[in-house]
Amino acid sequence: MEMLTSLSFLDKGEEWPPHSQTERLKKYADNRKRFKNKLGFDRKKYNHIISLVGNKFRVIDYKFLVNFYKKVSLKTSDLLFVEPPTISAGDDETKNTVIEQIKDLSDLDNIGAQAAIDASRYVDALLTIRIPSADDEETQAQAYIGITSPLFWFPVTSPMNLKEITQHVIAWTSTETIIENGKEKEVTYLDYQIHYKGHYERGRKYVEKGTIGDAIFVGQPVEVEDEEGVIGKQVSELERVDTGLSSFAIIPAQNVVTSDTIFAIDDYDDFASLVEELQVRLEKIAHVLDKHADPSLSGPTSALTYDEETGEWFLKMGDYYHRNSKEDPAVEYVTWDGKLESSFQEIELLLDLIAVLSEMGSAIFDRDSLKGSGLSGRALRLLYVNPLTKVRRIRNRFDRSFKEAIALCSEVGYEGKSVEKKDISIKWNDGLPNDKKEDAEIGVIRTGGKATDTIVAQIMEQDGLTKEDAEAKYAEIVKETNARLLSEEPEPNFFEDEEDEGEGEEI
């Protein structure tokens, strides 16, 4: 795939969308349909399958759509954000307050979950820094984090370094109905934003038959001076919007990226063909079972009855059909061995390969939870070794992207209380349920005879509380313990009198 190295793809007469990006955009669109289980019928794959299985199974129409794609993406998102990460700036209360404000305004946990799904299905998730107007009472002109679809993303890289993005272009088409010469006419527009560090430019152009046309002047009138020194007003094609940010307002949060491209690798390609083959096998099995449920009959001609009205012979069920000898055929259902055992064995093999290539292991099927077996925390994490490793790769990239997004947001509208990227710490969780017994055993060891942790810290870890809440809870425990000790009467000492009497005796 060729990279875009200039903004010339937005010029008049250029093809839209750019030819070099059509393969990427098609993959995005296909994966979006796969996620929604709406990819539909693929004629090329159908013809290939028919060439293998023959005309007998031309009824194959993909009515069994096994949506492993959605399962993989949702599982990835769950392991990242179903247990929200803890974001802080150490002990700096001012910076922590700013971070909490950004999280609340952005609905960051929900945005993160959406970004994880996009990184899985599209390979590229795009975080955006939204700069509201000063009149926005809800945000009070404070920047917050949003998300946009990579279907609208056209990054421009440096010709000298294809890994260096010089501009982010966000572009999309829309259709409107206008009145021209008294008649309705549909017009297609291309709206676009060219993002630079600290500002972006937005414009609009006509698109006709897939080709970019004239620009529509959208900028504010500005005073210009012509060659004769006459000052007039001119409207530009582009309108400049200052963001007040030190970097781009577009921040990619991606899946695995290789050294020869700026686009990531999606989760679906490696096992898509296996899912399609699995759907064919299920369709064939269903066809065989349907035929067995409505079988044909065989028997002697004497079993048939002639219908004088229709002129057709038919088999009247429930009658007695005599056989003159053992050699005469009996009336019976025609059945055959569909060799379903082999089909089920192949299905098991396909499922195993899907589990391996999706890097989800047996966790993708949730077989243990469906059987009702209770796994310990250690066993559950062993079961999820592959998914957790896969998610950790994405997490490493998300960590950098979310820190950058939070730091950029803090630059606009937070009374100058900006938070630097290096000050932000994100504690990621794995989304798996904790084993209370194992946690308690660890806690006893860590606070017992060889204590390596404070009781307050253990309360924070075991109960998921903040430091202030944990200290308050510990103070309440100490208070109740002291009150109980004071209320208890001391046990009587039955030997006290004997000891007192023995003190005055002489020996």
Predicted segments — roles?
Residues 433-458:
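C-terminal structured domain segments
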Residues 86-94, 98, 322-442, 481:
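Surface-exposed loop-to-helix/strand elements on domain peripheries
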Residues 1-167, 175-179, 499-507:
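Extended, helix-rich architectural segments
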Residues 121, 126-261:
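Extended, regular secondary-structure scaffolds
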